[in-house]
Amino acid sequence: YTQFEWVEAGIGSTGTTPGSFRLQHDILSKGKVDLLFVEAAVNDDTNRFSALEQVRGMEGEVRHALESNPEMDIVMLHFIYDPFIPMIARRQMPDVILNHERVANHYLIPSINLCQEIGERMQDGEFTWDDFGGTHPKPFGHKFYAAAIGHLFDEMWKGVSPAGTIEA
């Protein structure tokens, strides 16, 4: 089995602009990074970063990471929070996710749109927002996040570059 050394560098309520400035000190300075997860849809939205700031911030994180290790694998995640739920119900993707996806597409980074998946599952009556645990999920909600990441890894290990949304 692969031995992992985890660097937990998440700071709540920040987003990509502060994240791009913190990346070197809080993550890259700890040693060679082989796998990096990035997620900021909720905080870039709540902090009201402009579309340009969202793209620049996410690209700042991705580009700086790849400059430090061009072989680094990056996975972009898109989480869900209350204001995104009615948008997903109307089949409207939040602008912040579209902006971050511009960066993912440019750098050919796989992404997992958990916002869409969780929103659609709630629309289908599979569970409620309260069951899921809200913006900071309960263990029940985390199972969906973990399953989606596992599914992405399964697809990538098969040598498949997933097109579209990866689901749990």
Regions from the language model: what does each represent?
Residues 2-15:
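A short beta-strand-loop structural module common to alpha/beta enzyme folds
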Residues 2, 20-165:
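Alpha-helical cap/lid subdomain in secreted, periplasmic
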